[in-house]
């Protein structure tokens, strides 16, 4: 009888948590890599991604993404980083008001893939994401998706600019992102975007400190088609930096990815990245390219093996060649 009473009490206490938490989902993603080059070989832990979604009511929802990764400056050698924290309010139909920290919707890759490597078509992001692409933005905006027969979508977002952090803007200027896309077929998406920001003198972005004020504009275009057999993804971004006392300098970053499913679970692929810098606003940044040849083995939709050969060429530096293997999972 005592055990029965204790069990009943536990159910009564736990009941409210089950009721209120029934629309919350917690998922995880992780990857482990192995790399080999002429300088040596290493095993490495990738990012462990904690992915939370929750429907608070019929209009309000939440998305949170926190990663845990190696950090040389941490006493435990690991650090947590909040990559996305989004509160979504459904205004009408497929139109939403969003607030928080998002992946800046400048192109298909940044808008479609989160930090779970299991969904990446290749092991790493293209080179452009290490340079001029603003990966994250913290602010407020509106978005729409799957509108009409062409599945039209749009994003308008105002945020703290480059050089800011997640709790404080470093100047009075705000960045603005406008993007739109449509889907002429079920597997194809074509889109374009415009990003504008004023970077203050002394700000640091993409690992570079700006010694002059820069008005940055980014124009991006993308086309993606992931069919049953053929996978194609091509994106390009033209950057225009209006630099105090210098004038306008340009940067062009692009990549092309192609994969072909030769068997149900086997997809060989190639990717070519290219970045061309022009002008003093980019400091020590050098023109670079990257060739990737690989194969992806899809164990299932939550477990993937990838093997790649990478050749990276940077102006004024020796070529870097390596072989990388990765296992990525979701759970």
What is each model feature region?
Residues 163-178, 201:
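Surface loops at the rim/top face of extracytoplasmic beta-rich domains
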Residues 23-35, 39-161, 172-174, 181-190, ...:
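Outer membrane beta-barrel
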Residues 1-24:
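Bacterial Sec-dependent N-terminal signal peptides
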Residues 13-15, 68, 111, 245:
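Alpha-helical transmembrane segments and their juxtamembrane interfaces
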Residues 31-38, 74-75, 86-90, 98-101, ...:
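Outer-membrane beta-barrel pore domains
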